[in-house]
Amino acid sequence: MSWPHNKNDWPGLFEKIPNVVGKIIKCLTEHQRVDLLVKNTKNINNTRIYLKKIGCNISNIKFHKLETDRLWLRDSGPIFLVNKKNRKKIILDFKFNAWSKYKNFRSDNKINKHISSYLNIESILPKKVNSNKFERVVMEGGAFDNNGSSSILLTRECLLSSKQERNKGFKKIDYENLFSEYL
């Protein structure tokens, strides 16, 4: 998870957001560890105090100093895969471009490298061929759902939108080939 800090993502609502995220963390820390990305050391200290005050099990929280652009890691975070034969884990590190909507996403693109290094899991950068040069594929984790048995559920609007185009020139067949290769 990432601790909320970008007030522009929640116009007029930001003051309520830390409390909502805090409640989620409180529920989670009753049963499991939470890895929490926080902007800087000062914010880590303030966040720790706040979470302790609302009853979170602080011993189940691992704080990571890492600046992010927004808190929604479902889309910007890593995709974990497990090889069914040898149980080896890998991370698919897609490029994230904030839904082709916002200009601030560079920090979010550092999340997967941090997680890969912290967990000591190999990271793969899915690439596409475009104009005779290799480019990373832009993808949000929330754009698809995979059952681990060769079936995948995709969001056409997300992947093939001309208004918020993720991968210029990509067609349906390109995404089919991409998922066939990496998933």
Which residues does each predicted region cover?
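The feature marks the mature, well-folded catalytic cores of soluble enzymes
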Residues: 2-183
